[in-house]
Amino acid sequence: MIFPKLLSYSSSDLEMGFIPSDPQHCLVPVTATISPTGSAAGDNFSFLVATPSALAESGKFGWGRGILIVDSFTWAGVERSLNRLLAHAARDTWQDVAQALNKELLWEFDGYQPG
């Protein structure tokens, strides 16, 4: 059984340790690097951390894949949410783990076809 592990996570829009000016009204893109436990290299999975009010104001409508909806943004909350997701994603192969995570997050290799 392959168990996924969170190696790192960050945002291109918000430096780690800082919070948005209004943590209850924000959209923060995040990329998480996730690997099989024991591996130093991982795959990138991206998602948007969004509050309901910011999501409504942005006019972005969709089914919700790749969006973590929170009442208020905190880095600790993002990490907790990721770890909860990973706790339920163990599978027989890394490919199966990544496909399971890809149902909620946006996997960098989604749709990739080797040439």
Task: Indicate where each model-derived feature is located.
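Short helix/strand-capping turn motifs
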Residues: 1-94
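Short, compact, well-ordered microdomains
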Residues: 80-115
